[in-house]
Amino acid sequence: MGRSESQMDITDINTPKPKKKQRWTPLEISLSVLVLLLTVIAVTMIALYATYDDGICKSSDCIKSAARLIQNMDATAEPCTDFFKYACGGWLKRNVIPETSSRYSNFDILRDELEVILKDVLQEPKTEDIVAVQKAKTLYRSCVNETAIDSRGGQPLLKLLPDVYGWPVATQNWEQTYGTSWSAEKSIAQLNSNYGKKVLINFFVGTDDKNSMNHIIHIDQPRLGLPSRDYYECTGIYKEACTAYVDFMIAVAKLIRQEEGLPIDENQISVEMNKVMELEKEIANATTKSEDRNDPMLLYNKMTLAQIQNNFSLEINGKPFSWSNFTNEIMSTVNINIPNEEDVVVYAPEYLIKLKPILTKYFPRDFQNLFSWRFIMDLVSSLSRTYKDSRNAFRKALYGTTSESATWRRCANYVNGNMENAVGRLYVEAAFAGESKHVVEDLIAQIREVFIQTLDDLTWMDAETKKKAEEKALAIKERIGYPDDIVSNDNKLNNEYLELNYKEDEYFENIIQNLKFSQSKQLKKLREKVDKDEWITGAAIVNAFYSSGRNQIVFPAGILQPPFFSAQQSNSLNYGGIGMVIGHEITHGFDDNGRNFNKDGDLVDWWTQQSANNFKEQSQCMVYQYGNFSWDLAGGQHLNGINTLGENIADNGGIGQAYRAYQNYVKKNGEEKLLPGIDLNHKQLFFLNFAQVWCGTYRPEYAVNSIKTDVHSPGNFRIIGSLQNSVEFSEAFQCPKNSYMNPEKKCRVW
């Protein structure tokens, strides 16, 4: 039998025997040792590199922050010559103002992004939505329902006009229909009480400045159809706006007459609307300039209703104007009777005196044409496309925009403005990181402490006033993120909007409902105490606020995001961002307006005469500094150093306090790791992030508008003005003395 294959020998009998193993040569041994050593060194180096701390932060958040800062800046610019160009040059090259925008800035980009979130949360109904949220979503859907809006033309407005004495220019036989029953008191009161529209006389219920727990009636000068009284010069840079304004009136009057089936006499319409412009121009000239209305002590004139009748006896259409009838016509809508002994605060006595001779020159038809027009112009954008388009040239003249914002953007903002707590709930649930609240609370505590410590450095303020200032700073109440109730208390939120009932196909009626609801709510407050725990803003807002009557600072959820704040970004950026904003809002309690209110929010003079005089002297430095800035986009006009003083004081105080708070942080916690790819230390990064918040630009038309209407300086001057006054900035960037960013004369109030 042969052998099994499994047992075959594995070595062939013919395979030669192996040779005896040879030893390694000294060279081979040396090379092997060398390779081993190199391998060990390489592994060690890799291990060391992986754990080596080179002082550079390599986290994804640091990389993102560095990329954002680098992208926005122009490193080739000289920081000591023009820090705006240095900080924002890259941003300006990359960004073009959208056709729908009058200006564009980092602030506006954040607002655009917030609007996207609002759109997402408002457009999708959910079965679990509480009633208040359902109403917000219904209101939004009615607003974006352009098919329904366009199909109705101007009919919703035409149905409403008889409730406000009609619009004479667009009414056949107005004198016969309305003229006999018309009275100025009733006409002005109806627009005010039902729709919150204040024409000729601004009557409103608000907090009593001298007793901030109570509400009181106020009488003030009205807002105007054009942005400011300056526009009514109607020459030079204002000529186009005046022409577009009258053309806007004429176009709407023709549309209404056409829709009513009335004949159109273009010459007659033009004559009537030019008369409206003439009347409004006289009213504008009677108003007091904004720079003369900055002292709340001088604005506050308390008197009884009977005294108002004696002091400001007006006459319209040959009849004495009854202040009592006018007041009660408004307040009767909320079932409140106003006796002649009722106290009223008059903010504009000079206006009322100047108004008297104007009123005798015009007829009821002229007044009603103006009153109804001022109401109609607000409602045109709620009507069909034909009506909306009538506003195009006017919008271009005031804002420089050639296109409307997307419908969904306008609607998201409208719903947010009218149902801020319902929308705030949706925003918070979708986008707000709750842990931010505690970090910001700590920042507020730090910056408040710095403000109080800084009082010791002030040589212009005496000890008595410093003590009162410290008490006020300690009494400031903060509100961060959102009111807890909007998320946790469904019943309270539902009850807030209980009276509102919207229909998806009746957007115009929904708007009217909101106007009535809002005005009724405000008028009813006259006999109620002020709720100082109430938030003065919604959560879905990219902004921050100070209330002098409440001595309260508010930082809504919408602003607690980069570049202002992130729990993950470097602290230098947080202090330069939200830290500066916190300091800014605290300082508002001590600016040219806020300093007149005490720790309880009452208009009380708590300053010694010497300290008050010194404050005005210190402030005057900033009035001159900012008033000397010439803005090319506004035709070379100079900024108004008086109107912008409060904001400029707050900017300067805020940047100084935030920087000192950051220095304290570094002393306590040590230096932070540097950001990758950007050759700046954290002192420099603090100022860079502060500046980049204000990167932006304006359309020339809106620059002309805002230089007269905005109490803030334009972004570039907010950067330059405050940093020119900062010794710490010049030290951080080693700016030579008398360079543009480091002038010898520096202004400081706080």
Curated annotation (Swiss-Prot):
| Known regulation of activity | Inhibited by mixanpril, an orally-active drug used for the treatment of hypertension.
Where would I find glycosylation on this chain? Answer: N145, N285, N311, N325, N628
The membrane-spanning stretches of this chain are 29-51
Stretches assigned to the Peptidase M13 domain: 56-750
User: Which residue spans belong to the Cytoplasmic compartment?
Assistant: 2-28
Per the Swiss-Prot or TrEMBL record, what residue ranges does the short sequence motif Stop-transfer sequence cover? 16-23
Q: How is the cofactor bound?
A: Binds 1 zinc ion per subunit.
This chain belongs to which protein, by name?
Answer: Neprilysin
